[in-house]
């Protein structure tokens, strides 16, 4: 393997918004360079998870090595490092960009530049990548390549005079892209003589070999059977195998600076080999790790409960297995009077949450109830102390706290300007603070808002898409905590608090939400032998209340005529029984009721 000159290596990635044809383009590159034979080809070859193919998104990174004979009759090695395009996975994107020297910026010629593309382009520019603009889907009837080129120049400031028009589906322009990669993407720096450093840009769990780590050698070289040290986790391992992805794994004896490969070293869990960590040699380690490593912190939390209590052990095992391949997933056990045993889980964002839930249901065959998503609140206690809380039901009572702060995000929404009004309306409904509005082109606008994260994690994305016919796109990042007039809204069923329905809401919205919650529960909870009050409360103050009337059993049906005192005695006995029942009786809330209420727009 070492006969490859560093000057003949090109490491690049593809930046694109969801649905702009990134995976199809990757397939076409693999096919045209002969890396994957026609008969083995399947659509979206690099998206190995069924879920990725179905949703058409890239979740876990993949990498592939291609050999390409260029027009100058030299053979080059092209390493394609795949990146996820979704905002939840932006840290993973930033790491894979650090492993590259160039990027293909793929823009749909019929749709134009979208928010997440922009966010990733700025990351690429920060890493000094050579960016090659590619206009995909030029074969579509609605494609307007010239207009989109102008848009790229105006929005991003990239020179598009040598942008490439292509159609990944029909294969037009693929040769031009390969030539552009060879000519325009710089070769890696030749740092074979320096101490070994390699950047982990992805890892996944293999049940037979332990964690498989994808890495890019930045300096020095790695040999089979060497002992390695991971600088952030301070753990050391002996290499079992190293190799390249072509795109199936092939073992090699050595990889040197500039090359991209995989390693297996009997690593037990993905958390030990975090994305962004630096690999070095145990016997002659590098002095300092590569910059930019950070652990991904969850931003969105929810409770996961099995619908069948017997499945709790299975849920625990499945979460343990999932965590082996998803280091960003955090969980801890939680119990609830209404739902039984379950787990409180933390995720990077809403998409991450949906994917984990779907993988649990699909790969591990579980049936789950998911409580409403919440964020981490900062609760300032009276004694100048503060605590962070991710579960609304554990927030202290009003007399024990001074204020609640919630996380805010800075959000940029890109949309055609005819949707300006509806989007501003949506942001105002969600307590957004207007910051700025920029016209990027004559018919597209950027709205910048600062908005509470709690308002974004519910259904903001769906609402934004439906109000703009799918044309708007957004991206956001955390900007810190702010004090707000927030209250804990509890739901009491027969004077008992139902934890899964507790939420943190703004005081102005509390009445409306409380009202709709109790009305919905009244429809869904079946009648009992006694009257059930359903109340929404803030602290000790009831703000909305409904009651479910009792079922009436006719105790007088056996008395035909006869003395009135006999009837009175029976009625009195019934009233006494009902009183006792009300004091002792537990209301079984059906799970459908919880499901429906959780679906109620937050």
Swiss-Prot record:
Membrane topology: Peripheral membrane protein
Alphabetized CDD domains for the sequence: EF4_II, EF4_III, LepA, lepA_C
Keyword Cell inner membrane found: yes
Record GO biological process: positive regulation of translation; translation
Pfam family, one: EFG_C
Keywords, comma-separated and alphabetical: Cell inner membrane, Cell membrane, GTP-binding, Hydrolase, Membrane, Nucleotide-binding, Protein biosynthesis
UniProt: GTP binding residues: 19-24, 136-139
GO molecular function, one term: ribosome binding
Catalytic activity reported: GTP + H2O = GDP + phosphate + H(+)
Coiled coil: none
Ranges for domain tr-type G: 7-189
Entry's family note: Belongs to the TRAFAC class translation factor GTPase superfamily. Classic translation factor GTPase family. LepA subfamily.
Record's function text: Required for accurate and efficient protein synthesis under certain stress conditions. May act as a fidelity factor of the translation reaction, by catalyzing a one-codon backward translocation of tRNAs on improperly translocated ribosomes. Back-translocation proceeds from a post-translocation (POST) complex to a pre-translocation (PRE) complex, thus giving elongation factor G a second chance to translocate the tRNAs correctly. Binds to ribosomes in a GTP-dependent manner.
NCBIfam families per the UniProt record, alphabetical: lepA (TIGR01393), small_GTP (TIGR00231)
Identification of the protein by name: Elongation factor 4
């Amino acid at each position: 393997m070492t006969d490859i000159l560093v000057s003949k290596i090109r490491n690049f990635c593809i930046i694109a918004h969801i649905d702009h044809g990134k995976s199809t383009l990757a397939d076409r590159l693999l096919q045209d360079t002969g890396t994957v034979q026609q008969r083995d080809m399947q659509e979206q070859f690099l998206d190995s998870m069924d879920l990725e193919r179905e949703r058409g998104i890239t979740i876990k990174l993949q990498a592939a090595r291609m050999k390409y004979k260029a027009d100058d009759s030299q053979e080059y090695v092209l390493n394609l490092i795949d990146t996820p395009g979704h905002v939840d996975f932006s840290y993973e994107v930033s790491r894979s960009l650090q492993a590259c020297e160039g990027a293909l910026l793929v823009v749909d010629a019929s749709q134009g530049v979208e928010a997440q593309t922009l966010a990733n382009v700025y990351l690429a520019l920060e890493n000094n990548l050579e960016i090659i603009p590619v206009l995909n889907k030029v074969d579509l009837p609605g494609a307007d390549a010239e207009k989109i080129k102008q848009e790229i120049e105006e929005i991003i400031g990239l020179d598009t005079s040598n942008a490439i028009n292509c159609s990944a589906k029909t294969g037009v322009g693929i040769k031009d892209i390969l030539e552009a990669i060879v000519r325009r993407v710089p070769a890696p720096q030749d740092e074979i003589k320096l101490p070994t450093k390699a950047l982990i840009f992805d890892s996944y769990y293999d049940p037979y070999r332990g964690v498989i780590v994808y890495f890019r050698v930045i300096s020095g070289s790695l040999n089979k059977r060497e002992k390695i040290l991971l600088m952030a986790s301070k753990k050391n391992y002996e290499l079992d195998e190293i190799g390249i992805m072509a795109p199936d794994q092939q073992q090699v004896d050595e990889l040197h600076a500039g090359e991209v490969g995989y390693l297996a070293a009997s690593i037990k869990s993905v958390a030990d080999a975090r994305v962004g960590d630096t690999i070095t040699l145990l016997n002659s380690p590098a002095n300092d790790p590569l910059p930019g490593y950070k652990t991904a912190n969850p931003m969105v939390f929810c409770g996961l409960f099995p619908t069948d209590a017997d499945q709790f052990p299975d849920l625990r095992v499945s979460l343990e297995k999932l965590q082996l391949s998803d280091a960003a997933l955090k969980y801890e056990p939680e119990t609830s009077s209404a739902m039984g045993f379950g787990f409180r889980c933390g995720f990077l964002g809403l998409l991450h949450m949906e994917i984990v839930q779907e993988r649990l249901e699909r790969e591990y065959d579980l049936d789950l109830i998911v409580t409403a998503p919440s964020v981490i609140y900062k609760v300032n206690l009276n004694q100048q102390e503060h605590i962070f809380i991710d579960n609304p039901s554990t927030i202290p009572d009003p007399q024990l706290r001074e204020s609640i702060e919630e996380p805010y995000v800075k959000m940029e929404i890109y949309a055609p300007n005819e949707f300006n009004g509806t989007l501003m309306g949506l942001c105002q409904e969600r307590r957004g603070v207007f910051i700025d509005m920029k016209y990027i082109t004559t018919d597209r606008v950027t709205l910048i808002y600062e908005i509470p994260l709690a308002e974004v994690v519910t259904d903001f994305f769906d609402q934004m898409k439906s109000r703009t016919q799918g044309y708007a796109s957004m991206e956001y990042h955390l900007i810190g905590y702010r004090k707000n007039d927030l209250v804990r809204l509890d739901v009491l069923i027969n004077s008992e608090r139902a934890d899964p329905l507790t939420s943190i809401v703004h005081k102005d919205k509390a009445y409306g939400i409380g009202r709709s919650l109790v009305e919905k529960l009244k429809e869904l909870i079946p009648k009992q032998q006694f009257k059930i009050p359903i109340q929404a409360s803030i602290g000790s103050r009831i703000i909305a209340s409904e009651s479910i009337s009792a079922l009436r059993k006719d105790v007088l049906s056996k008395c035909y005529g006869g003395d009135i005192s006999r009837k009175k005695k029976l009625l009195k006995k019934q009233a006494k029984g009902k009183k006792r029942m009300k004091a002792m009786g537990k209301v079984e809330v059906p799970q459908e009721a919880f499901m429906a209420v959780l679906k109620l727009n937050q």
